[in-house]
Amino acid sequence: MPATIAVTHLGCEKNRIDTEHMLGLLAQAGYQIDSDEDKAEYVLVNTCSFIGPARTESVRTLVNLAEQGKKIIIAGCLPQMFRDELLKEIPEAVAIVGTGDYHRIVEVVERSRTGERVSLVSATPTYIADEHLPRYRTTTEAVAYLKIAEGCDYRCAFCIIPHLRGDQRSRPIESIVAEAKQLASEGVKELILISQISTNYGLDLYGKPRLADLLRALGEVDIPWVRVHYAYPTGLTDELLTAVEQTANVLPYFDVPLQHSHPEVLRAMNRPWQADLNTRLLERIRERLPEATLRTTLIVGFPGESEAHFAHLCAFVERSEFDHVGVFAYSREENTAAANLEGQIPEAIKKRRRRDLMRLQQTISQRRNASQVGRVVPVLIEQENTQKKVWLGRSARFSPEIDGQVIVCGGAALNQLIPVRITAATPYDLCGEVFQA
């Protein structure tokens, strides 16, 4: 009789897709999937190990399950970095699976059921799933993430992604479009393209970046919203901006992780080319696409970051008027160049700088959101709050999980795009009412 398996997903949306493929494969093989860990014979945990706090959450989850005596299958980034340590410290782990091996999850479970303790971790991940691999989506019905490439060829000083995910490997345009059509047939209204560096999509496969060509091809798919995450500054070329302009279903939403503004800090981060580009890039986007939404992520407390460097970053944020900003305190990670740099910043200073920068951005976000008041915009309805008699959704300026939401009054329907008049704004969210023409 097939075993019952509970699955826990931790970490980023790239990890989520891997989890969804494992769920699809297990279900196809006849295994029972249950959200209740108490009823499951096995618990599969897809872990994150990108930065310290994520690793702590993964370890805490594993320890809690071990204390309950569960048979644990550990997948994802944590085994990729700490295979031997996990096998030694968590005897309840009946199997571990690396980031390049999740497509063999059925084999792993079957071998573990015979009593074998399975360790399947490729030293260098090379696998990437395509449209033929089964997938069981865990997002709302109308939203799907689509991985266009895996891995990264860059070596930023603070980042361990190349160790966790390997070098970049892109999927063919035809494969991505085929999966997008599958998702459209399932009722998906918003498709979110993800990879480590989306603007480098195709470089390894075609000899040059081809994100613009991919977007044009996806313009022929019946999905109203196509959103791109993880754009690299140098990849936002005129050709790409033109593709966004000319492709009706591609949202002018630019998620561009800049990390810092000061040339000295960027040089230490191994991103020296970026400093002169930042301001000109933002100006060019807004000139071409006045309705563009701009999101970035920044790191404070990087080794050697002085108060002058931090002041430069604050001035840059104030001048740039981003719609959304995520701020991370630098996390010192083994196997990165930054771990060995002099001038490591005390935790208290990192926390203070993060707090100060977030407070600065709150004022800007309030102003940017307030500019939406009075407009009628499409909102994707994702949830109903029956107690408060409101709907929760997102306009095109909000990406799931990382940005805000729109609180909607009036008659709406789940998983549909509804016209909403925006009536109020906070630093993070909007309020509105269903618009009757």
Swiss-Prot record:
Domain Radical SAM core: start-end pairs: 138-367
Entry-linked HAMAP family: MTTase_RimO
Main location: cytoplasm
Nucleus recorded as keyword: no
This protein's record includes keyword S-adenosyl-L-methionine: yes
Domain of life per record: Bacteria
PROSITE patterns associated with the record: MTTASE_N (PS51449), MTTASE_RADICAL (PS01278), RADICAL_SAM (PS51918), TRAM (PS50926)
Subcellular location(s) of the protein: Cytoplasm
Chain ranges of the MTTase N-terminal domain: 3-114
Sites where the protein binds [4Fe-4S] cluster 2: 152, 156, 159
Function: Catalyzes the methylthiolation of an aspartic acid residue of ribosomal protein uS12.
Native organism taxonomy: Bacteria, Bacillati, Cyanobacteriota, Cyanophyceae, Gloeobacterales
Cofactor note (record): Binds 2 [4Fe-4S] clusters. One cluster is coordinated with 3 cysteines and an exchangeable S-adenosyl-L-methionine.
Disulphide bridges, residue numbers: none
A Pfam entry, by short name: Radical_SAM
Required co-factors: [4Fe-4S] cluster
SUPFAM superfamilies tied to this protein: Radical SAM enzymes
GO MF annotations in UniProt: 4 iron, 4 sulfur cluster binding; aspartic acid methylthiotransferase activity; metal ion binding; protein methylthiotransferase activity
GO terms under biological process: tRNA modification
Positions annotated to bind [4Fe-4S] cluster 1: 12, 48, 77
Encoding gene (name): rimO
EC number from the UniProt entry: 2.8.4.4
Catalysed reactions, semicolon-separated: L-aspartate(89)-[ribosomal protein uS12]-hydrogen + (sulfur carrier)-SH + AH2 + 2 S-adenosyl-L-methionine = 3-methylsulfanyl-L-aspartate(89)-[ribosomal protein uS12]-hydrogen + (sulfur carrier)-H + 5'-deoxyadenosine + L-methionine + A + S-adenosyl-L-homocysteine + 2 H(+)
Annotated GO CC locations: cytosol
Keywords from the named record: 4Fe-4S, Cytoplasm, Iron, Iron-sulfur, Metal-binding, S-adenosyl-L-methionine, Transferase
Residue ranges of domain TRAM in the record: 370-436
Family: Belongs to the methylthiotransferase family. RimO subfamily.
Protein name per Swiss-Prot or TrEMBL: Ribosomal protein uS12 methylthiotransferase RimO
